[in-house]
A protein has these predicted regions:
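Substrate-binding cleft of extracellular glycoside hydrolase catalytic domains
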Residues: 1-122
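Functionally critical loop-and-helix segments that line ligand-binding/catalytic clefts
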Residues: 1-18, 138-172
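Surface-exposed, flexible loop/turn segments at secondary-structure boundaries
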Residues: 32, 65, 133, 155, ...
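Short amphipathic alpha-helical surface micro-motifs
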Residues: 39, 72-74, 129-131, 144-148
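Intrinsically disordered, low-complexity segments enriched in small/polar residues
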Residues: 40, 58-60, 126, 164, ...
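Aromatic-lined carbohydrate-recognition surfaces of secreted/lumenal glycan-active proteins
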Residues: 56, 120-136, 146
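Conserved beta-strand termini and adjacent loop/short-helix elements that scaffold enzyme active sites
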Residues: 62, 93, 128-130, 150-152, ...
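Glycine-rich, charge-decorated loop segments at or immediately adjacent to ligand/cofactor-binding or catalytic sites
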Residues: 67-69, 133-143
Length: 172
């Protein structure tokens, strides 16, 4: 069974009632940069979760080495917009673009631990990256971490993988 969902940030139009899927992923921030559509997207997500329109929400942050400021931004933005909904998971978007090279496990895991404490359960924190970034940036990952793998050519079947992001060349 396939489950489809979109990744929505300030680079796309805000989510609306035309959204067709049962899962939605929205960006809260890129480090300390606050996504300009987060409040609107999160309000829609919360209402859709409460009404049964959505089954699950994913709120993600593009991780940056200033992990404490990154964590504070995530917490403050969610708290300012109704708090963490019980059917929302937080996702760490781990990508090499704009981040220092090499193993970032120390600061990524510090962010993970901070947000796991905030969420009340480490199972509510998932990771996202392509195989190369997982293997170079996040060498030491928390035990039991579930991940979404970004791979457009083939399914990489990463340890803990729960989803595979790909493209079929179409867009809506």
């Amino acid at each position: 069974m396939d489950s489809f969902f979109a990744d929505v940030s300030e680079f796309q139009a805000p989510v609306s009632d035309s959204y067709p899927y049962k899962i939605l992923s929205i960006r809260v921030c890129d480090g300390t940069h606050q996504d300009s559509n987060f409040a609107q997207n999160y309000a829609w997500m919360r209402n859709a979760l409460d009404s049964g329109r959505l089954d699950c929400g994913i709120v993600y942050t593009y991780v940056r080495p200033n992990w404490q400021d990154n964590a504070n931004t995530v917490r403050q933005m969610i708290d300012a917009n109704g708090g963490l909904h019980p059917r929302v998971v937080l996702m760490l978007d781990v990508e090499s673009g704009g981040n220092p090279g090499g193993d970032g496990s120390a600061w990524i895991n510090a962010l993970y631990n901070n947000l796991a404490e905030y969420a009340g359960n480490p199972a509510r924190i998932i990771g996202y990256a392509n195989q190369g970034d997982f293997n170079t940036m996040w060498l030491s990952r928390p035990k039991g971490l579930r991940v979404i793998a970004a791979s457009y050519g083939s399914n990489p079947l990463l340890p803990g993988q729960i989803a595979h992001q790909y493209t079929d060349g179409a867009y809506g």
